[in-house]
Amino acid sequence: MKITVIGAGNVGATATQRIVEKQLAREVVLVDVVDGVPQGKALDMYESAPVELFDTRVVGTTGYEETAGSDIILITAGRPRKPGMSRDDLLAMNTEIVKTVTEEAVSKSPNAIIIVVSNPLDVMTYVAYVRSGFPKERVIGMAGVLDTARFRTFIAMELNVSVQDVNAFVLGGHGDSMVPVVKYTTVAGIPISELLPQDRIAALVDRARKGGIEIVNYLKTGSAYYAPSASAVEMIDAIVNDRKRIMPCSAYVTGQYGLNDVFVGVPVKLGRGGVEQVLEINLDEADRNALQASANEVKESCEKVNSMMQ
């Protein structure tokens, strides 16, 4: 198994370290445009091998020759969010970046599965899909895994329980229009509605929607990377080990939930083939309408980037 990580910033570098520590590949190639950064970080990680006891080879490069034959391509490259900047503000500047790195990477690894982390997430996943020419099953966005992790964390904090006992699904676009599905939120199998009053549930839903910007506002000069990298690597683990995990991911829908031809967060079965199935769960009218509205927002942004990719 060979994995390429594009972007040696905080998310990419942290994801690379997690991949090698979990020994999910025989080789990981870290790519960045800034000469010296991927090489230095890769060497630093490789030097931790005797301590962490992994044999995965870590290579840093500014080119793509070393990435040839990759099984998975993780795209984290892009400009970061800054305070006061919405994900949509990133649209123009990151479209060109994701377009370029996708074309470079897939020319060397035509059979890979692409996982996109760059923001705005769902739209950048669409860019990678269009520029790669890959089947829809092999292009996936890391959205719902992270959003769900945040929602589960906030619930665990509120109830003072283990996060392991909290189950939830956050669907829709990776942004303010995401849809935390309260109907499927449980703690050790107990519906959240039996444990918290409606106003507290609503507050946690709102905090989950603003989870990314909350961290941006704290950091002032950067954005989240520990939870995003962990979420991406959880997806990689599901693919590498063919686990058939059920995860909320940004996937291309073709009629499910009444949606067509758009990348949006939905429950999927993730295995060695990438998105092996999109699961269609029952949603109440409010959640279904919210999912439709979220998908419409993504579609509007995709229409904008179509002209940028001409």
From Swiss-Prot:
Q: What is this protein called?
A: Malate dehydrogenase
What PANTHER family has UniProt attached to this entry?
L-2-HYDROXYCARBOXYLATE DEHYDROGENASE (NAD(P)(+)), L-LACTATE DEHYDROGENASE
Q: Which NCBIfam families match?
A: MalateDH_bact (TIGR01763), PRK06223.1 (NF004863)
**UniProt-annotated catalytic positions:** H174 (proton acceptor)
GO MF annotations, alphabetized: L-lactate dehydrogenase activity; L-malate dehydrogenase (NAD+) activity
Q: Which domain of life is it from?
A: Bacteria
Write down the InterPro entries for this protein, in alphabetical order.
L-lactate/malate_DH, Lactate/malate_DH_C, Lactate/malate_DH_N, Lactate_DH/Glyco_Ohase_4_C, Malate_DH_type3, NAD(P)-bd_dom_sf
CDD domains found in the cross-reference section: LDH-like_MDH (cd01339)
EC number(s) per entry: 1.1.1.37
The record lists NAD(+) as bound by: G7, A8, G9, N10, V11, G12, D32, N94, V117, S118, N119
Q: Which GO terms describe its biological process?
A: lactate metabolic process; tricarboxylic acid cycle
One family name in Pfam for this protein: Ldh_1_N
Q: Which UniProt keywords apply?
A: NAD, Oxidoreductase, Tricarboxylic acid cycle
The UniProt record lists the keyword NAD: yes
What residues bind substrate, as annotated? R81, R87, N119, R150
The record lists its disulfide bonds as none
Stated role: Catalyzes the reversible oxidation of malate to oxaloacetate.
**Reactions performed catalytically:** (S)-malate + NAD(+) = oxaloacetate + NADH + H(+)
Q: Please report which protein family the annotation says this sequence is part of.
A: Belongs to the LDH/MDH superfamily. MDH type 3 family.
